[in-house]
Amino acid sequence: MVKFKAIRGVAFDLDGTLVDSAPGLARAIDMALAHQGLPAAGEALVSTWIGNGADVLVERALHWAGREHNAQLVAQTRELFDHYYAKTVEQGSQLFPQVKATLAQLAANGLPIGLITNKPTPFVAPLLTSLGISDYFSVIIGGDDVVVKKPHPAPLYLLLGKLGLHAREMLFVGDSRNDIMAAQAAGCPCIGLTYGYNYGEAIATSHPDCVLAHFADLLPAIGLPSLKDQEV
């Protein structure tokens, strides 16, 4: 694609893009709610709250549970969430299909790979290690590494500086409107994935430069051989 001809690096969102993390997040939120005598929300609902970081996830859960939340209640629930999520983050997460093989091909072609996630930073490295993909990333930016998270472009600016790339040279791949808005604000070309967590909205409504249904389709989209072609 012409839009991607200048690409010299690729960066990814984490939850809903590389990793199906909804089961672990839902278990942690439900246990935090139960600890306070509140009902469980369940994975289907929690998956629509993912993408803006842990504080917003907690706020959405409390709002759903009918609790008028203040800073103290949010902080208390966030502490409970962190406690439980530390126990569920690894076993409650799995890679989406063909993620590892696709990352391997990007790395084999000499492209630096970055990660930008709103997930609290302490959870990121252990999760990547448990999934066997940590070594593919040149730079990892978690939710605590910047003052403002996606959809603000600040995390992308930080990554561009660390990789020494111009905005037009870095492709950003994500599954939610926050990812697309951040990329567009930073001036980076972007791809939206249809299978992730986007608040029940079609990713195409955010107008990414390209929409893909399968992670491995990224390779031919940027001019590299597909995984299927490499098997021949």
UniProtKB/Swiss-Prot annotation:
The EC number(s) attached to this protein equal 3.1.3.18
What the entry lists under NCBIfam families is as follows: HAD-SF-IA-v1 (TIGR01549), HAD-SF-IA-v3 (TIGR01509), PGP_bact (TIGR01449), PRK13222.1-2 (NF009695), PRK13222.1-4 (NF009697)
What keywords would UniProt list here?
Carbohydrate metabolism, Chloride, Hydrolase, Magnesium, Metal-binding
GO MF terms listed in the record are:
metal ion binding; phosphoglycolate phosphatase activity
**GO BP annotations, alphabetical order:** carbohydrate metabolic process; DNA repair; glycolate biosynthetic process
The protein's name: Phosphoglycolate phosphatase
Function according to Swiss-Prot or TrEMBL = Specifically catalyzes the dephosphorylation of 2-phosphoglycolate. Is involved in the dissimilation of the intracellular 2-phosphoglycolate formed during the DNA repair of 3'-phosphoglycolate ends, a major class of DNA lesions induced by oxidative stress.
Q: So what does this thing catalyse?
A: 2-phosphoglycolate + H2O = glycolate + phosphate
Q: Name one Pfam family in it.
A: HAD_2
The family assignment reads: Belongs to the HAD-like hydrolase superfamily. CbbY/CbbZ/Gph/YieH family.
The active site consists of D13
Q: What cofactor does this one take?
A: Mg(2+); chloride
Describe which pathway this protein belongs to, using the record's wording. Organic acid metabolism; glycolate biosynthesis; glycolate from 2-phosphoglycolate: step 1/1
**What do we know about how this protein assembles, alone or with others?**
Monomer.
Give the matching SUPFAM superfamilies.
Answer: HAD-like
Gene3D superfamilies (UniProt xref): HAD superfamily/HAD-like, Putative phosphatase, domain 2
- InterPro entries, alphabetized: HAD-like_hydrolase_sf, HAD-like_sf, HAD-SF_hydro_IA, HAD_2, HAD_sf, PGP-like_dom2, PGPase_prok
Question: Binding positions for Mg(2+)?
Answer: D13, D15, D175
Single GO cellular component term? cytosol
